[in-house]
Amino acid sequence: MSLPELKNFRRIVVKVGSSLLIDSAAGEVRATWLAALAADIAALHRDGRDVMVVSSGSIALGRSRLKLPRGPLKLEESQAAAAVGQIALARIWSEVLGAHGIGAGQILVTFQDTEERRRYLNARSTIAKLLEWRAVPVINENDTVATAEIRYGDNDRLAARVATMASADLLILLSDIDGLYTAPPVANPDAELIPVVESVSAEIEAMAGGAESELSRGGMYTKIEAAKIATTAGTHMLIANGKIEHPLQAIADGGRCTWFLTPANPVTARKRWIAGSLEPKGTLTIDAGAVTALRAGKSLLPAGVIRVDGQFARGDAVLVRGPDTHEIGRGLVAYDAEDADKIKGRSSPDVLIILGISGRSEMIHRDDLVIGSVPGV
């Protein structure tokens, strides 16, 4: 089987763990390594790729800055350390990417931001705008306010959620190990690297060892969980050794890693979810011109809406019907029912006047819209 090549992916999420970013002995950033990684990111960026970074390290950096003793931290201590570390982490990424003329935008999220639909849409829109502006979003779990999430390995799963949210076609988990082995390689010298996983089966899950370092809360188990999230959403994933300099270039050169493949693509998987998994909360009836536009792949604008029915919140699924009441499709609406009713039939510039805020130009963005049927639904 021929494996994918890095050059063929257009939108990439790179997850960097604490054990890679921070020198455990000195408690400081591995500056030379990070500069090399930033150069790799800049190379992808120059080639026209959209690149996002999910970076751990805020608690570890905060511990160092505050000179806290080694050992476990209580919840409130972890949160306070994260508050200090987040400032340092943002500055570090801004500097290393800025050296290549790339702007960095910090986004702090929790799992709730990726699962509650209104917050999900806000975060997704922010990421999309940063990418449109050719900035690199640097995303970290908001450990200052998170509770149960401040625990071992969540940034692996968070990275998968971010990749799904951003419709990325590749998630790279940089680790302190080459990939998934048939057994934990430290304990078993006969363990073999698995170069490709086409489906996360029970057998694959059983191979997940407990590779963990003092600074990292991650392990192979959470990486397998991340793979399930990513591949279900149409995102390929790979695990590669990040301890070497220029780890992304090593992947591009065919270096050792484990690929987790998916037969779907992010847009198809997302639309399958919208079409088959969400209960519509209302209905938008649109005019004939809007029907033609939607079938041509356009977004639904307020001007094309002639009637709003139901009680729905921003981010809810709604049905879209033509003037003859025939169902055209369904999608995630960018306004609640009250505001949608106010701006129906109006041009996008009128939204600011009517609502007092600029709002979204689309009632439903085309990426959040399913017209007709989706394969597999």
Curated annotation (Swiss-Prot):
- Cite the binding residues for ATP: 15, 175-176
Q: What is this enzyme's catalytic activity, as reactions?
A: L-glutamate + ATP = L-glutamyl 5-phosphate + ADP
Where is the protein localized?
A: Cytoplasm
Q: Which GO terms describe its biological process?
A: L-proline biosynthetic process
Which pathway does it take part in? Amino-acid biosynthesis; L-proline biosynthesis; L-glutamate 5-semialdehyde from L-glutamate: step 1/2
UniProt-listed CDD domains: AAK_G5K_ProB (cd04242), PUA_G5K (cd21157)
Q: What does the entry list as the binding residues for substrate?
A: 56, 143, 155
Q: Does the keyword DNA damage apply?
A: no
Q: In Gene Ontology terms, what is one molecular function of this protein?
A: glutamate 5-kinase activity
GO CC terms on record? cytosol
Ranges for domain PUA? 281-358
EC number(s) per UniProt? 2.7.2.11
Q: Which key words are in the record?
A: Amino-acid biosynthesis, ATP-binding, Cytoplasm, Kinase, Nucleotide-binding, Proline biosynthesis, Transferase
| Chief place where the protein resides | cytoplasm
| Highest taxon, organism lineage | Bacteria
Say what the protein does. Catalyzes the transfer of a phosphate group to glutamate to form L-glutamate 5-phosphate.
Q: Give the UniProt family note.
A: Belongs to the glutamate 5-kinase family.
Q: What is this protein called?
A: Glutamate 5-kinase
* Species name: Rhodopseudomonas palustris (strain BisA53)
Give the gene symbol. Answer: proB
